[in-house]
A protein has these predicted regions:
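Surface-exposed, low-hydrophobicity beta-strand/loop segments enriched in small/polar/acidic residues
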Residues: 2-147
Length: 147
C-alpha cells in the first residue's frame, strides 16, 4: 500500500441511494460490479427517523439488480426514534463473500418498518480496485474529485 496515492484515487463512489425519505418500501442502491473490487463498503446515513424498525442489507444480484438474495445485514434497529436519529450503519463486503451465490454484483437496500420513515442516504465505496486509479470507476453522478 502506497501512502503517496491520494484517498480519492484509492476509493471510488460506486453506488448510492440519494438522500430521500426512506419508509416501508425498500429502496435499493446502484448495482456494483464486484469484478472490479476486492472490497465494498456500504454506509447508510440516517436522519430524523420515525419510531420504526430499520433494516440495512447487502444483496448479491444480477447486473440489473434482479434475483437479489440477502448477502449480509446489519442487526435490525429497534423502533426508537431517539436512538436511531442521526446515526450510521456500515456493511463491508469482500469479493469472496459472493462465491456461494455465484453472482458478481452487489446492491444495498434500506427500509423501515412503517409508512413514516425518515430522511436517509446510502453511499457505497469501492475499496482495493483491481486496476488503479479506483476513481476511474466512480459513478457518473460524481461531479468532482479534488486530490
Amino acid at each position: 500500500m502506497s501512502i503517496n496515492i491520494a484517498a480519492g484515487e484509492k476509493l471510488a463512489v460506486v453506488g448510492a441511494i440519494n438522500p430521500a425519505t426512506i419508509a416501508n418500501t425498500e429502496i435499493f442502491s446502484t448495482v456494483v460490479d464486484m469484478s472490479k473490487w476486492h472490497q465494498l463498503l456500504g454506509v447508510a446515513m440516517l436522519g430524523n427517523m420515525a419510531a420504526e424498525t430499520i433494516d440495512f442489507k447487502a444483496y448479491s444480484c444480477n447486473s440489473d439488480g434482479s434475483s437479489s438474495v440477502a448477502l449480509k445485514s446489519c442487526t435490525q434497529l429497534a423502533a426508537n426514534a431517539a436512538t436511531n436519529d442521526n446515526t450510521q450503519l456500515v456493511i463491508s463486503v469482500r469479493a469472496e463473500d459472493l462465491s456461494a451465490s455465484g453472482k458478481q454484483y452487489v446492491r444495498f437496500g434500506l427500509v423501515t418498518g412503517g409508512a413514516t420513515g425518515g430522511p436517509a442516504a446510502v453511499l457505497a465505496l469501492g475499496v482495493d480496485a483491481h486496476y488503479q486509479p479506483a476513481s476511474d470507476n466512480d459513478l457518473a453522478s460524481v461531479q468532482q474529485i479534488k486530490l
